[in-house]
C-alpha cells in the first residue's frame, strides 16, 4: 500500500478503522524507511509489541466512540506516527536540517507510546481491577490483600515443581552450571532455554529449581506448564479456589491475566520469585510479555522449542555428540552417578571441568596448571612465578619473556623496544616506520595474524574500535543525548544545528592546526557565520580644500550576529571517541551562541577539553543496555540519562571500559601548548571552584 494511503487510513482511525490493522500498516511502512535507522526500527518494534495488547482493549470497547475512549491518546499518537513515517519516506538525502528535526520527532513519538503504556495504561488497569473486585464482593484492594497474605504455601503447591530423578544426568552437569550462572547475573530478568523437542529442557529446569543455590536465592519458585494452547482462565480459577474465593467466570483472558498480575505483585511481598514457564510456543510470545511486571527480585525462566529474542537472553541447550551419548548410556546402566552438589568448576583456559585440588587459583578463577601458559614461550607459568607474571589484553607472560616479546611481530628476543604509555604493549622500534598499521582511535599497532580495517581516507581502525564505529544515523541519538548532557550542566543549547560526519580532507581544509608544532590531526570543526562590519578606529582630520584625511577603518565581528551552522566530526571513530569530540565542539558552539567571542585561546580550548573529560567520566559510570527504553512497555518512563552505553548495541565490553580510560588519559597527559596546558589550567580552576564560576573567570580574562 502506498504510504499516502497509509497516512489517510491512520487519519481515519477515530472513525472506526481497526486499530490493530492500522498498527500493522504503519509498522510495515516504518520498516521501509532506510534513512532513519535505527530509530524507525525502534518505532516499528515498539508498535509491534503494542499490537496484541491494544487489539484486546479495542475488542472490549466495541460499540464505544474511540474519539472519547481510553484509546484516544493512542489514536492521536498513531496519527502522528503515520504522518511522520510519510514525511520521512519523502525526505531528500541532502536535507540535513529536516533529518535532524524528524529524528527528534520520531524519538518523541516513541516516548509518547511508552508513556501511554507506563502511566495511563497502568491507571486503566488499576481501575479495571477495582471494578472487577467490586463485582466479586471485595470492598477494596486491602480486602484482596488480606485474602492473599497467607497463600504463599498454597500457591507453591498449585505450581509445584516435579521432584527430580535421584540420579543426576551426566550430560546435564555443564548446562546446569552454565544456566545457573546466566540466571544469577545482575540485570538479567528473563532467560529462555531453547532446544529441539525431547532434548531435556524440562528436565534441566526441574533440576535447576531443586538446586540448593537456586532455592537459597529464590524464596518462592513457581512452575507453570504453558503448552501450545494455554488456558489463562483456568490458571485464574485455580488461584481463586486456593484463596477461598468463588471461581467466578472471567469475561475474557485479559481479566484473568490482570488478576494473575495482581497476585504476583502480592506474592512479591513474601520474598524473591522465580517463575518457570514451561513449553511455550512461538504463538504465545505476547503471553510472555504479560508476565513481565515490575517486582524486586523477580525472574522468569522459559523453556521452548523456539527463540524469543525480544524477551531476553537465550540459553541454547545443545544436542549430545557421539562420544557423550556413549558415555551417557554407560552411566545410565550403572545408575550410580552422585548428585551435582557441589558443581564442578571450569578451567579459565580450556573451559573444561577442573578439580579444586588439581587447579591453580588466579584472581578467583581456577586453571589447570598446564593451561596457564606464557604467550611468548608457550611454557606453563609456575606457581612461584604467579606474583611477577604479566597479564594484559594480549595474553599472559613470564616477566622475563614479556620484557623481550614484541606483540606486533612476535619476536621473542628484542634487544631494544618501544612501549605504549597507556596500553603498555612492547614492540620493536622499527614498526613505527615500517608501515605497520596503527589504529586511528586507540593508537595500537596491528599485531601479525590480525587484520585492521582501512578507511577510504587512508586511516586504519582496529577490530575492537570498528565494532562501535558510528555512521551518520547512529550519531543522531548521541547528538540529542549530548544536548541533554549540556542542559544538565545548566548550559542548555537552544539553537538546532546538524551533526555531520566527514572525511579528514574536508576538516583540514576547514580549520588550520592550532598546535602546529605537534601536528595534531583535526578531528572536528564547529562551523559558524559571523557578520563582519567595518568600523572607524580613529576620527578623521580635515586637510587642504576641506577634504577628510587619515580616517582609519578596521574590520570588526558583530558578536550577536554569530551563528553556529553545523558541527563536523571525522567519520569512522567509535562512539566513545566521537562523543568526547562532540562534547568538545558543543562547548565551542555554546560559547559562540551566547556571544562569547575572542576569548583567550588556551582557556577556551581548555574549557572545551574539560567538558569532553566530564562526558567521558559520565560514561565511566554508565550501565549497560540503557537503549532498552523501546524494548518493553513496562520499563521506566523517565528519560534515558546522558550517560548511555558504550557500544551501538548497548553492551559494555572490557575494551569499551578500557577505551574510556584511554581517552581520559589522552586528555590528561596531552603535552601540547594549547590543548594540554589549557586542560590542566581550566581543570584546576574547576576543581578549586565550580564549572559556572570557572566560566565567569574565563569570560573576564578576554
UniProtKB/Swiss-Prot annotation:
Residues 1-155 form the RPW8 domain. Residues 345-416 form the LIM zinc-binding domain. GO terms for molecular function: ADP binding; metal ion binding. The keyword Transmembrane does not apply. Keywords: LIM domain, Metal-binding, Zinc. Residues 630-649 are annotated as: Disordered. Residues 178-305 form the NB-ARC domain. Residues 630-647 have a biased composition (Low complexity). The keyword Transmembrane helix does not apply. Coiled coil: none annotated. This is Protein DA1-related 5. It comes from Arabidopsis thaliana (Mouse-ear cress). The lineage of its organism: Eukaryota, Viridiplantae, Streptophyta, Embryophyta, Tracheophyta. The gene is DAR5.
